[in-house]
Amino acid sequence: MPDPSQLNIDRSYPGRWTITFNNPPINMFVPSTIVELGALMTGLEADPSVKVVVFESANPDFFVAHLDVAQAAERPEVLGLWRDFVLRLSATPVVSIAKIRGRTRGIGNEFVLSCDMRFASRQNTLFGNPEVGVGLVPGGGALEWLPRLVGRSRALEIVLSGDDFDADIAERYGWVNRALDDGDLDSFVDTLARRLASFDRETLAAAKAQINRFGTPTAAEIQSSNDLFFPMLALPSAQARRARIRNIGYGIPSDFELNFGQYLPTFGRADDETNKQPD
C-alpha cells in the first residue's frame, strides 16, 4: 500500500507500524484525511504481521487541530466514512496507541478516544471538544466514548463547556492512560509498543476482543450523533459563530487555534450584547 500524502507510515520495526499525521500548518482533518485513514485500515487488516500501530504527529503544537468544517460540509458522506473507520479501529486485532503531543480537539479527540490506549505529554497537550461553543454537537464519537471512559458528569463538563483540558486532568478523569513528562513520552510508548510486538498476535487479538465486550460504541450510536451534525451546521446561530471564528484565526496558525477553549465564552457575550434591548 503506498503511503498516503497526509499519513507518513513507518513499517521498519517488525510487528509495528508508526503513523505520523502531517497536514500543515495545523494538522486539520479534511475529507481526504478520512479517506486515507480508511485506506490505512484496509492495509492494517490485510497484513497479518502487524500487531501494534502507534499514531503520532509531526507538529508538536497540534496532534490534530479539528475537522475542517467547510470542506466537510461539501462532502457530507465523510462522516459515514469516519464512523466506519473508528469502528474498524476499535475492532481490529491490531492494538492502537495514540502518542499525543499538541492540541487534540474535536475530531482529533474523537480519533484518540477510538484508539485502544492514549499517552499524552504533560507539558504540551490540550484536549477538548469545542463544538457546542460554535453551535454544533460532536458528531464523530465523543458523545459515545466519553461517558464510557470518564462517566456521565465529566462527559457533560467536557462537551458542554467546550473548554481545553490539560493532560493531568485527562489522566485524572480516565480520558488517557497516562500523562507523561514530555521527555519520557517517546521512550515509554516505544518500550510498550516493542513489548506488545513481541507477543503472539492471536493472543493480543483474543484479549482485546474479550475486553471490547465491556464497552465500545455501536454503529447506531455513532450514527445518531452523525445525524445531528450537518443539520446543526445549517442553523443561523451556528453559521454566525463560525463566521466570527473565521475572522480571528480559525484554521491557520494563530492564538485562537492555540487557545480555542478560552475564546468560546466571548462569542456568547457578543450574542448578549447584540440581543440587548435598548433602554
Labelled PLM ranges:
Residues 1-56, 270-279:
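Conserved CoA-thioester-binding segment of acyl-CoA-metabolizing enzymes
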Residues 19, 55, 68, 111-113, ...:
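Hydrophobic/aromatic residues within transmembrane alpha-helices
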Residues 88-201:
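Crotonase-fold acyl-CoA enzyme core
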Residues 1-14, 60, 162, 166-167, ...:
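C-terminal alpha-helix plus adjacent terminal tail
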